[in-house]
A protein has these predicted regions:
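Charged, helix-rich terminal subdomains or tails
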Residues: 1-167
Length: 167
């Protein structure tokens, strides 16, 4: 089954315009073969990016922002910098699930705002960082493509956190 999944993901990447693409999967990815379309793989919420999009938008923008503004257990949680807000894996999962549950440009903004508010630090000196994170997450959440990139970035961060915990 794994070889089949890998083959289907490869087809998704190749079907992206320009073919210089990467197809990733996680809990939000759905893919299937469309027999009416000659058996070609089709994507539904799949994380398919050109390499440039992935490097610039997912890694260079979203992951970089998360690493610079959040203390992430098992990744940078032991950092000497004290200007980041702490974010546990559980909270990141909740944010990711809310983002994945959004359809098109619609999402449950009230729940999303509540979950983001749980990041709010007690320390006054961390308020500017929290405001940046809250504002940036909201900007990304309301645009479908940006939201998809943020979900992918969160998946990478969560997987890295999981790897560090299990090591």
């Amino acid at each position: 089954r794994m070889a089949e999944v890998t083959g289907e993901l490869e087809e998704l990447a190749k079907s992206n315009p320009g073919k210089n693409s990467i197809a990733l999967f996680g809990s939000g990815t759905e893919y299937h073969r469309n027999e009416k379309n000659g058996g070609a793989a089709e994507k539904e919420n799949a994380a398919v990016y050109t390499w440039d999009e992935f490097i610039e938008k997912v890694h260079g923008e979203k992951i970089k922002f998360l690493m610079e503004h959040m203390l992430l257990d098992g990744i940078n949680g032991n950092s000497k910098r004290n200007d980041r807000i702490s974010a546990g894996k559980s909270l990141l999962y909740k944010l990711m699930n809310l983002l994945q549950g959004a359809a098109g440009d619609r999402m449950d903004l009230a729940r999303f705002a509540y979950t983001l508010a749980r990041l709010k630090p007690k320390e006054k000196e961390l308020q500017p960082c929290y405001e940046k994170v809250r504002s940036q997450f909201y900007q990304w959440a309301v645009k479908e493509e940006e939201r998809k990139e943020l979900v992918t970035a969160l998946q990478f961060i969560i997987y890295r956190m999981r790897d560090k915990e299990e090591a």
